[in-house]
UniProtKB/Swiss-Prot annotation:
Family: Belongs to the bacterial ribosomal protein bS20 family.
Pfam families: Ribosomal_S20p
Keyword annotations from UniProtKB, A to Z: Ribonucleoprotein, Ribosomal protein, RNA-binding, rRNA-binding
Presence of the UniProt keyword Transmembrane in the record: no
InterPro entries linked to this entry: Ribosomal_bS20, Ribosomal_bS20_sf
Described function: Binds directly to 16S ribosomal RNA.
Record's protein name: Small ribosomal subunit protein bS20
Taxonomic lineage of the native organism: Bacteria, Pseudomonadati, Chlorobiota, Chlorobiia, Chlorobiales
HAMAP family: Ribosomal_bS20
Ranges where the record places region Disordered: 1-26
GO molecular function: small ribosomal subunit rRNA binding; structural constituent of ribosome
Biased composition (Basic and acidic residues): 1-18
Signal sequence range: none
């Protein structure tokens, strides 16, 4: 446990920030997995496109705000785009 008042405050701040970061990353994981499930179940193209767009928007937002590294966001977007393109071609 922290011995100083400022250290206690830093601990509280880091716990809040850690929880916020975890929740945002979890939202992203859910969006990506939802899109992949939709593709696996051969859902309608329009539904998959909406899921794709929301996942890409979330990736952009998290990358710009440094919740995840910008390169990781770019790599994930590329993977999702390839997955989406292969799904569209298959139909």
């Amino acid at each position: 446990m922290p011995l100083h008042k400022s250290a206690e405050k830093r601990l509280r701040q880091s716990e809040r920030r850690n929880a916020r970061n975890r929740s945002r990353k979890k939202e992203l994981k859910v969006l990506v997995k939802t899109m992949q499930k939709l593709i696996d179940t051969s859902a309608e193209k329009a539904v998959v496109e909406v899921a794709y767009r929301s996942a890409v928007q979330k990736l952009d937002r998290l990358g710009v705000k440094n919740y995840i590294h910008a390169n990781k966001a770019s790599r994930k977007k590329s993977q999702l785009t390839r997955l989406m393109n292969s799904y569209v071609k298959a139909d």
